[in-house]
Amino acid sequence: MEQYQEDFVEFILDSGALKFGNFTLKSGRISPYFFNVGVFNTGQYLSQLGKFYAIAIENSGLDFDVLFGPSYKGIPLVTATAVAFNNNFNKDVSYSFNRKEVKTYGEGGGIVGHSLEGNILIIDDVITAGTAIHEAVDIIKANGATVKGVIVAVDRQEKGKSGQSAIQEVEQNFGISVFSIINLSNVVDYLKQGNNHALIDRIEVQR
């Protein structure tokens, strides 16, 4: 685990973004943990979050032209990450996001920010059912651009009915790369540093 990944695990635990208990996910599965990106509701939190995304993207070596954040949760993620690229890597990165309701007045259209052209990197929080990514891919292709990949904050590493994880299904269905700041194994490795054996056992059962 890289240092920035360990720092990110600490960040989501200290902020309360990663919670443990019994949660029903969008997919209908019951999970012993839940990642809530809505906790990052201050400028300081968003600044830190954007920096972690930017570091992970830089480390991936992925070449892209525009960052795209699916509305609504992807909007603060993509803007924070674009700012983080400028502040931490001196890179002026283009970004855009979609409107849920297409605007029929003013400049109109369904895309806000940079036009979708070239290679697009999608930013989201997690992939549970893959619905939001499917919609984002459709939007990007409809605008004549190419989906280069997807980055999420946390790879849950949970297998669905197909025997594959949601991320593996997205990679297979769309032929794109999906990577994350951290995955569940990173969280487990971090928890092993403390006396969290019962919690680790519950998490491992879901994998």
UniProtKB/Swiss-Prot annotation:
One of its GO terms (cellular component) is cytoplasm. Its EC number is 2.4.2.10. Its cofactor is Mg(2+). 5-phospho-alpha-D-ribose 1-diphosphate binds at residues 26, 72-73, 99-100, 103, 124-132. Pfam families: Pribosyltran. It catalyses: orotidine 5'-phosphate + diphosphate = orotate + 5-phospho-alpha-D-ribose 1-diphosphate. Pathway: Pyrimidine metabolism; UMP biosynthesis via de novo pathway; UMP from orotate: step 1/2. GO terms for molecular function: magnesium ion binding; orotate phosphoribosyltransferase activity. The keyword Transferase applies. The keyword Magnesium applies. Orotate binds at F34, F35, T128, R156. GO terms for biological process: 'de novo' pyrimidine nucleobase biosynthetic process; 'de novo' UMP biosynthetic process; pyrimidine ribonucleoside biosynthetic process. Homodimer. Belongs to the purine/pyrimidine phosphoribosyltransferase family. PyrE subfamily. Catalyzes the transfer of a ribosyl phosphate group from 5-phosphoribose 1-diphosphate to orotate, leading to the formation of orotidine monophosphate (OMP). This is Orotate phosphoribosyltransferase. The lineage of its organism: Bacteria, Pseudomonadati, Pseudomonadota, Gammaproteobacteria, Candidatus Pseudothioglobaceae.
